Regions:
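Extended acidic, low-complexity intrinsically disordered regions
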Residues: 1-470
């Protein structure tokens, strides 16, 4: 475990020198090549990753500081070993205490709620080739005939090492259909996962899971019927941040757009050269908007984040399950009003209203947004008046739900309370679909966003136009 309040200033893992006149690196420095120590220190920590893997050691990083500490460089050994990362402001905070207690949670037998020194081996039928894995694992570079020449993430192997294994560990494996011979539709193929792990003092355990599937024809309706758009979005997000580690953000966005156009062209129903005829079935309809919010997310657009924050965001996304990943990609938004119980609303600027409260969950932070009328009534103390009991209950409801969200999640998300038009409202506005901007025809009093970003509707119109081209 590493507990730090600042970056390394000496040694091979040096992040910044001790001269206070030199600022720590930013994303602009990384892009322009002006981050003096970044490449050297990153290489040092990558070499450390292999040593940790060989010794089956897990590295946890607890960083509490108002500035960066070098998490971007240290990310490699933390991620590959399956370690925990926390970025906070103070070691005296409840956030730090909760994260530390979480690490040492144990069962009724006194064993930690995690397994160590794990390996996952994959065995496939001859028509399926293994490309690699993305997640908290390391390739053991053990090749056989089922390993593809194409590598994705930790590839070139059919066996991976995991320093730690919990009930929330999530790894994405990638496969390629072999083209040596044409497979026959209706015939079966198998993928087997063989997992070894050490469970407390109870020795080594072995678990074998075998999945069987049938081959179908290229244009079979079963392909569409079996498509899981939520899981697909989660996997594409991991692929996108994997690409973002090696390419410029604009190139990653272009890659995502090209993949989405191919997807829409293949699975959409349309008359060629007629965008108005374009339709996607219910199994595919949400996928384009997932990609819209992914390309706008902090995982790809790093403009408002430090390198340490970006490393933290990407590390968590790369190990989170489908549900958590979707919240990171497309946050949830609930509306509280006098009209009834809370309801989910569109992640759109039009959802902001003076007489409602919004509860926004982006996984990393939770925002309670008070409309201007609600805020004014609260400042006048109406919630303390027995004659306005319904208003008091309205104020309490989102706070109770927000506390539950914060209590269930580790690392602990930041809780932000803000008023409409207040400075803290930017945390919500930055994630909303800008359907109304400063360039729109809007009515007086309507909420709008100052931005040059395209709205979801404009994005979909362009997608439809490109998908139906010959």
């Amino acid at each position: 475990m590493v507990f730090t309040s600042g970056p390394a200033t000496v040694g091979p893992g040096m992040i910044v020198d001790s001269d206070l006149g030199n600022a720590i690196r930013t994303h602009r420095d990384l892009i322009s090549g002006h981050a003096t120590y970044y490449k050297k220190s990153s290489e040092f920590y990558k070499q450390l990753s292999q040593r940790l893997c060989d010794a089956s050691i897990v590295l946890d990083l607890f960083a509490c500081s108002l500035d960066q500490v070098g998490a971007a460089e240290i990310k490699a050994p933390v991620e590959s070993s399956g370690g925990f990362m926390m970025l906070g402001e103070s070691f005296e905070s409840d956030q730090f205490r909760k994260c530390l207690r979480h690490i040492f949670n144990h069962d009724e037998d006194g064993n930690l709620k995690m397994c160590f020194d794990a390996t996952i081996e994959i065995v496939t039928t001859k028509d399926v080739k293994i490309c690699g894995a993305l997640g908290p694992c390391v390739s053991l570079r053990k090749k056989n005939s089922s390993v593809s020449e194409k590598e994705i993430g930790e590839g070139g192997t059919n066996m991976w090492k995991l320093g730690i294994l919990t009930n929330k560990t999530c790894i994405a494996f990638f496969y390629q259909v072999g083209d040596e011979q044409k497979v026959q539709a209706g015939s079966a193929f198998f993928i087997q996962f063989i997992t070894h792990y050490r469970l407390g003092n109870m020795g080594i355990r072995k678990r074998v899971t075998t999945a069987a599937r049938r081959w179908v024809g290229n244009h079979s309706p079963e392909i569409a019927a079996g498509f899981d758009q939520e899981a697909a979005a989660s996997v594409m997000a991991r692929l996108a941040i994997h690409e973002a580690e090696r390419r410029y953000a604009r190139d990653v966005i272009r890659w995502l757009d090209n993949m989405l156009i191919r997807f829409a062209s293949k699975f959409g129903d349309y008359v060629q050269e007629d965008p108005s005829s374009f339709r996607l079935s219910s199994n595919f309809s949400l996928y384009p908007q997932f990609m819209y919010y992914l390309r706008r997310s902090q995982f790809i657009d790093v403009f408002n984040s430090s390198p340490d924050e970006t490393a933290f965001f990407r590390l968590l996304l790369n190990r989170e399950g489908v549900v958590g990943s979707l919240i990171m990609i497309q946050p949830t938004l609930f509306q509280y009003s006098f009209d009834g119980p809370p309801i989910p609303v569109l992640l759109d600027v039009c959802s902001i209203s003076p007489d409602v409260i919004l509860l926004f969950d982006s996984y990393f932070y939770v925002v309670i947004h008070y409309g201007s009328k609600i805020s004014q009534w609260r400042k006048l103390g109406y919630d303390k008046d027995p004659n306005h009991e319904s208003f008091r209950k309205l104020l309490e409801a989102p706070e109770l739900d927000a506390e539950q969200l914060v209590a269930e999640r580790v690392p602990v998300p930041k809780l932000i309370k803000c008023d409409q038009h207040g400075s803290q409202a930017r945390f919500l506005l930055a994630k909303l679909n800008p359907s109304v901007t400063q360039n729109s025809m809007y009515t007086d009093g309507a909420e709008f966003i100052f931005t040059d970003d395209v709205s979801l509707q404009v994005f979909m119109d362009h997608l439809q136009a490109l998908a139906v081209q010959g």
